[in-house]
């Protein structure tokens, strides 16, 4: 069953050039969870991985092919490779997997980790050609594996595409080494060595550089150039060829000889018919074969060991082994091709009887029965839409010819909704106009309900395009045109009315509309809209100052996601985003950080432009902790994304706050002025994101000493906040106003504003906005807490804020960031040992945390790395600085800080 060569690491490396610049990057690999070699074909991913691991003793190698997408097959090969890497420490898990005595891959991996607890040596398992895996269950299981595997194991992946293994999260957490085609491409020196090893006459550096530039360092192209030069006696510069790809061999001949030919004709025919189904029960099989003994025959074949497995936990459901299913499909198409269409048509009808339109439409398309496809779409299309099966629907509709499509108004409306739901807003109007014209040509009258659905859809597009007035007009028109039976469009129109009122600052109208939207959406099981309504309600409650109520409502959103399995929809990230914002304002930074990372994980397979909010939050958290070097990396991501994409002001305002706070911490007034010169100045500030944008403008003016401009903007800001009853934003604005008064030396006014802000914070809990200006208002809070006019609650709040401000400032002082290190190593009085044996950035961070009194375990938690990694960093820095123990490390750090004037 298992192919030994798939578990054998490649040989024949004698002709490969050694690549120290890549190998150097891999020296720290034991301290990372994942090493990813990612590049197009022909860049030597497998060769490089094999060369690097050639002298490592504990390595398991799994060469993947496109038949490995069956979870059972995959995990068996994986466990065999893992056993090879760990001296067979997981033998019990291997037996469980082979016997299918597992409830899920996660439970199996938990058994694996338990067995590996006694194996402590450094080890590696290689997944070669992982891009051939397309099974989401395997991807999900491998994400679990990577998250929970022991520290002494490193997973090595080679892939042509970015694998969906949580790499965005691992990258941000510095738990992954990525070797891309930029690193795998040869540089000039490697090109010279490569050709000198293969060409008798050698090659000079100029020619090597010319060739490298011509093929951009692509190793396979260079190999072809060398071969052409050798065999055709041509110059190197003349020889450029493409590379052909080879297909993997199949096991069909073996299965014919060893299994299929041993069966009687009737059984062979039965198996070929059933093989049109990925999984099946007796009812489906009866519909296909008309055999009343279907269940008994399936069970007897299962007992016979014919690659038929019962589905665990499912009564009388079965599937073929993945390879055997492929083999049967091949035999079916070769031996009974005349039955192919009828089999798929019958399968489609059978799946409809099982209430599974997704499966039915798949078979209807394979039968090429377009009328049946239309019938399924008309009857079940909206149900599939509500369940999120968008790609299946769109593929089916796009395959229809114009006559069929435009003969059915329900399908043209569904087509437009599919475009909207996938954020192709600019196409929606065109699709509806085209449909209207085509329906008229066919004398199909579009009733008022169709017009109502179209207007509801256009209203959603308008609000997404920041046209609230137009959206409101269209939504109200739609509600007047739709009866209660067209529930989806009524839900959307109601939602749009609520959202428009939210955007316009009419919160008392917006909230009940969103509550009604949620109720309707839950009633009709349109759960995406129910979640959207919860998110909107949460934002409205936050704006009204009811932050605890919003927090509890968010909990109901998380429950809905869990109950309806919406974990991977983008709205889940939206919920995590607003939860993180509340947690940040409550100074619960660890929890906020976790939400941001989870958001990145959800959006892993979406456009990087969607990551802006997560990076904005991570930057803000790092700034709050004083980790400016870490924040700087997030800021670079933010600036790159803002240059690459166009965002709604809600997104840019959040990102701009992080930028301004970073520049404020760095004292970078030049960057702040540049931002201010081009900053959008909205005409109003009637909602939370326009308030934030104007507050950013005020903050920039204050930092630049432009106090009059700051005062004018603040007056406008507070006027708008009070007009629209934006309680939480009024609270935030008071803190900024106090900062302005303090900068203008008006201490009494600043204290009065802080007192008012403290009173409001009793309701909102918004302490984060005090902390970001702690350096300015800390002393004022101390004086204010001594005054008798503060209530007990406000005094307690002020005292807690002073502790937090003091803690943050102390935290900032102990972090050895990049600027500090650069100044230190260039200081004329720095010890020669520091200059000649420079520490890495991470080793400096570890030294700073040792000085702060952190234990090894606390340092590992702070830097989010394994404890073994911290021990290695400590050992390295002790050697480099000639330190014997922790006490000496603290003294050394203290001396360096004193040298720099701290």
Swiss-Prot record:
**Which InterPro entries does the UniProt record give?**
P-loop_NTPase, Sig_transdc_resp-reg_C-effctor, TPR-like_helical_dom_sf, TPR_MalT, Tscrpt_reg_HTH_MalT, Tscrpt_reg_LuxR_C, WH-like_DNA-bd_sf
Residues annotated as domain HTH luxR-type: 832-897
What are the entry keywords? Answer: Activator, ATP-binding, Carbohydrate metabolism, DNA-binding, Nucleotide-binding, Transcription, Transcription regulation
Top-level taxon: Bacteria
Task: Indicate how activity is controlled.
Answer: Activated by ATP and maltotriose, which are both required for DNA binding.
GO MF, one term, reads: ATP binding
Keyword Transcription regulation listed? The answer is yes
Complex formation: Monomer in solution. Oligomerizes to an active state in the presence of the positive effectors ATP and maltotriose.
Name the record gives this protein: HTH-type transcriptional regulator MalT
Q: Lineage in the entry?
A: Bacteria, Pseudomonadati, Pseudomonadota, Gammaproteobacteria, Vibrionales
